[in-house]
């Protein structure tokens, strides 16, 4: 009886594992993106962690939350997480998110907004964005513009960094 039960359990577990593996490979890149938290690293080594929550009122739209860790050389507010928020439209993979550079560690008195799209056409997914950084240069407000390309990262960000 125990041998039969063990064989049935083994077959059942193997069947579930095979189904989960097949489902993961059949899932579109867009759906994998929405399945949980994902980390994206840009050319400066900065990390954006996104969590997508379905909008209760807008179809195919997701609220974006998470953290951004700035690692760009020559900038302030580095190495510590800042909350990010935004929106994602899954109909054509368009995203917009922003960060206010103020937390318990530092206040850089500035804000950055990124707008872009996810490109799933290559062997590795890319998030292509344009950004605007609003800040004060002395006593004069200014806006700096640029572009970031983020690559999805399989590395995890330390939980302590994400909760600071």
UniProtKB/Swiss-Prot annotation:
Pfam family, one: Avidin
Secretion signal, residue range per the UniProt entry: 1-22
GO cellular component, one term: extracellular region
Species this protein is from: Hoeflea phototrophica (strain DSM 17068 / NCIMB 14078 / DFL-43)
Disulfide bridges in this chain: 77-108
Domain notes: The C-terminal segment plays a key role in the formation and stabilization of the octameric configuration, since the short afifavidin (lacking the last 5 amino acids) is only dimeric.
Function as written in the Swiss-Prot or TrEMBL entry: The exact role played by hoefavidin in the host organism is still obscure. Forms a strong non-covalent complex with biotin and 2-iminobiotin.
Keywords: Biotin, Disulfide bond, Secreted, Signal
Lineage of the species this protein comes from: Bacteria, Pseudomonadati, Pseudomonadota, Alphaproteobacteria, Hyphomicrobiales
Subunit structure: Exhibits a dynamic oligomeric assembly: the apo form exits as homooctamers, which dissociate into homodimers upon biotin binding. The X-ray structure of the intact hoefavidin reveals unique crystal packing generated by an octameric cylindrical structure wherein the C-terminal segments of each monomer are introduced into the entrance of the biotin-binding site of an adjacent non-canonical monomer.
Family recorded in the similarity comment: Belongs to the avidin/streptavidin family.
Name this polypeptide is given: Hoefavidin
Residue ranges occupied by any Avidin-like domain in the UniProt entry: 32-155
Localization of this protein: Secreted
Molecular functions (GO terms): biotin binding; protein homodimerization activity
Highest rank taxon of the organism: Bacteria
Residues annotated for biotin binding in this entry: 42, 46, 68, 70, 76, 110, 112, 148
Biotechnology usage: The specific properties of hoefavidin make it an attractive target for novel biotechnological applications, including drug delivery, nanotechnology, and molecular labeling.
UniProt xrefs under Gene3D superfamilies: Avidin-like (2.40.128.30)
Temperature section of the record: Is hyperthermostable. Displays a Tm value of 84.9 degrees Celsius, which increases to 96.2 degrees Celsius upon biotin binding.
């Amino acid at each position: 009886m125990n041998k039969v039960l063990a064989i049935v359990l083994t077959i059942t577990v193997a069947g579930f594992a095979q189904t989960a593996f097949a489902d993961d490979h059949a899932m579109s890149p867009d759906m994998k993106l929405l399945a949980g938290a994902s980390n994206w690293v840009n050319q400066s080594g900065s990390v954006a962690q996104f969590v997508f929550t379905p909008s209760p009122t807008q179809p195919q739209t997701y609220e974006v939350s998470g953290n951004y860790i700035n690692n760009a050389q020559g900038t302030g507010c580095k190495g510590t997480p800042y909350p990010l928020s935004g929106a994602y439209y899954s109909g054509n993979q368009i995203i917009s998110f922003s960060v206010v550079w103020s937390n318990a560690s530092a206040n850089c008195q500035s804000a950055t907004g990124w707008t872009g799209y996810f490109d799933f056409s290559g062997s590795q997914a890319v998030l292509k964005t344009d950004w605007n950084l609003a800040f004060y240069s002395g006593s004069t407000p200014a806006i700096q513009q640029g572009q970031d390309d983020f690559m999805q990262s399989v590395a995890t960000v330390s939980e302590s960094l994400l909760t600071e």
